[in-house]
Amino acid sequence: MGVCVGGIHRRSLYEEHQLQSPQGVTYCEDFHLIVRLCYFARKVVNVHRPFYHYRQQEGSVMHNLNKKTERDEQWVYQDIIRFFKEQGVYKDYRKTMCWRMLKATQELVLDKSNWKAFQEMVPDKKHYIWDCPYINRKLKMNMWCLTHHLSWISLLMLNLRKFRHGRT
C-alpha cells in the first residue's frame, strides 16, 4: 500500500460515505482519508504527469516530528485497522498495517515505561517483526523479546545501549 500525496476526488465520495479528515490529527491525516477514498472508489486512475509542484515548508510537521506526531501516526494506523476489520478486509492488509504499526511504535521500545503500550498496540504485529523493512535488526530483536515475554533481554539490551551512549 503506497501513499498518495495528492489527488482529485469526486465530492460524492466524501458525501456518500461521510468522509472527512480526523479532527485534531496533524500527521498522517491524509493517509487516514486516502485509504477510505480508495476503498470506496469504484475506479482509481493513476496519471503519470505532474499537475502541481509539491513544496516542503521548513516549519511543516514533516520536519518537526515529536510525541504528538508519533501518537497521531499510531492512532491513524489503529483506526485504519479498525476500518479494515469493519469492512471485512483486514486479512488482505494485515501484513502491511502491522509493518506500519511496527514502524510507528519503534520509539516505544526504547523506553521501559512504554513497553506495555507497545505490546497492546495491535497484538498480531509480532508475527511480522522479522520481515518488516522499516526497522533495524536491534529493534527487531528487542521487539521480538518484548512480544514473546522475554523483557529481561530487552532490558539488558536497553541498558547496554544506554551504557554505550554514556547515559546511565
Regions flagged by a language model, labelled:
Residues D111-T168:
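Membrane-interface aromatic/basic loop that binds lipid-linked glycans or pyrophosphate carriers
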Residues T96-E107:
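Amphipathic alpha-helical repeat scaffolds of TPR domains
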Residues G7, L108-L110:
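Short, contiguous, well-ordered secondary-structure segments
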Residues Q23, Q87-D92:
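Inter-helical turn/loop segments and adjacent helix faces that build the functional surface
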Residues R49-E58, H63-V89, L110-I129:
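Catalytic core of nucleotide-sugar-dependent glycosyltransferases
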Residues Q56, Y93-T96:
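Short acidic alpha-helical/loop segments enriched in Asp/Glu that coordinate divalent cations
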Residues D30, T105, W130-C132:
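Short, charge-rich amphipathic alpha-helical segments embedded
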Residues M1-K67, E73:
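Conserved nucleotide-sugar donor-binding catalytic segment
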